[in-house]
Amino acid sequence: MLMLALSAGALPVARGLNVRVLVASGPEVTVRLPVTPLNPPASPLAPAPVVVPQPFSENTWTVGVRGGVLTLNGQDAGSTTLYLPPSPGSMVTIAGKTYRGGVLLRAAQGSVQAINVVDVEDYLRGVVPAEMPPSWPAAALAAQAVIARTYVAARVNPAQPYDTCATESCQVYRGVAAEQASADAAIQATAGQVVAYGGKPASTYFSSDSGGYTASSAEVWGRDLPYLPAKADPYSAGGPRARWRLEVAAAQVQAAAARFRVRVGTLRDVRVTRTSESGRAQEVTLTGSGGTARLTGTDAGSFVRALGAASSRATLSGPVGPTTPLVVEGSGAGHGVGLSQYGALGLARQGQDHLHILGFYYPGTALSLLAEAPGTGRPVLAQLRPLPTRPALLALTGRHGE
């Protein structure tokens, strides 16, 4: 098998490059940390200081907002922001969940925003096993680590109050509770590695299962990125949602149509009438007692997903009525753009390393090292190296067995 090595040479992997993750918000947020708050706040974008405050006994702080100013245990803190740094090796508990790093607290429109400020590599320890089963092969976990690092590197922006969130709207981040030795090893093995295009972090979208054909970014979001094309993906064939079937009650179909402002009376027939290269819905025709309407482009796929379908790579049966549910049959799960996690599993089980996995799902990209622009808190990329464009010496079986 062709093997590629990445040499860091004299360039250091970024250390002390912090990311700011919104982990909780509300009228009050409880924070537990064995250090007293600093005011004015230390810079959350700077490397952790060599000398830190002497830890006091563990404190629990109920943080609120009054008159646009933060309160600590009911007392006016005299500031709209506070940064609570940890002592070496300690952790911070925010709204009942434990994280590495510190916490930046902000008063924002009458609520408290709790933002975990954490080194990017420590952040990944709470992301990778939350997004991919930690029991999966090392190469698949390594690929997930690289795309997770790339995702957040592209979003670090000191001009904004935070860089990313902790939910599926961004990247799932569960903190210390999610950490697993296998994921930690994958993060360490790929330290600093990101996927780059045009000298910048690529948009490393991923989904659970492509259903055998990845979607292009253009067909799903209307944004054409050359390294996110529609392409055949035989390696996802063994996933649990490779094929699925769903029956949707007429009332649910009618409600979904109403959300898209389709007004054709009582629905009688709904079907996909045009698909993209990847087999995903690009036009849905809805016929009712008052006429016919069509949903096209991204609306077509969104409508199919609104029916409860795991993917828009689906067909609709046609007839629908009070006693006739709409039958939806399809393949895959998620939007289908970029890396397919079950495809990464299939490639890893066939002996491919993470470089070949990344190269297959993000063609035309390069592997780069993440560094930090001195004094800016912004990431920069160094040592670009093209990723392999296709898996090496691979039998296209699509099987996931060992």
Task: Describe the predicted segments one by one.
Residues M1-E402:
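Conserved, single-site charged/polar hotspot
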